[in-house]
Curated annotation (Swiss-Prot):
The lineage of its organism: Bacteria, Pseudomonadati, Pseudomonadota, Gammaproteobacteria, Cellvibrionales. Keywords: Allosteric enzyme, Cytoplasm, Hydrolase, Metal-binding, Protease, Sodium, Threonine protease. Its EC number is 3.4.25.2. Na(+) binds at G157, C160, T163. Allosterically activated by HslU binding. This is ATP-dependent protease subunit HslV. It is found in: Cytoplasm. One of its GO terms (biological process) is proteolysis involved in protein catabolic process. It catalyses: ATP-dependent cleavage of peptide bonds with broad specificity.
Amino acid sequence: MTTILSVRRDGQVVIGGDGQVSLGNTVMKGNARKVRRLYKNQVLAGFAGGTADAFTLFERFEAKLESHNGQLTRAAVELAKDWRTDRSLRRLEALLAVADKEASLIITGNGDVIQPEDDLIAIGSGGMYAQAAARALLENTQLDARNIVEKGLKIAGDICVYTNQNHTIEVLDY
């Protein structure tokens, strides 16, 4: 699977992810880009789950962002509505972590939209390791959001066999 981690702190929101694509117990690719900028570089998004499914969701989410003038929450809710009513979407196995200058959201495979506590998002197979590391760093250090994401992903990659050390990190200042 993968690890995607997002942290918001001191006027920055950061989403980072590793690059490993696995098929069963085999590493198929080590440098996949699972974190992207969307809607005029104003929205960050990362995915965990099936790669083809995630690209389908990226496309649909980006279309919703365009049709709702970059309003992240509105676009996420509209995508979730589609997800629940469109039979082909209901079979997609992917999670999206999305963030802009105002909100951080998880869009789940069930069509749920969740705004996590403390604007900390961690999804994928290594998500819980990254989340634990990030939470400890948020509570006990003054590190900026980017450094917390870097360290959280590194720790997850050291522990989770489905997460590697090839990271893509995007930063949005606000």
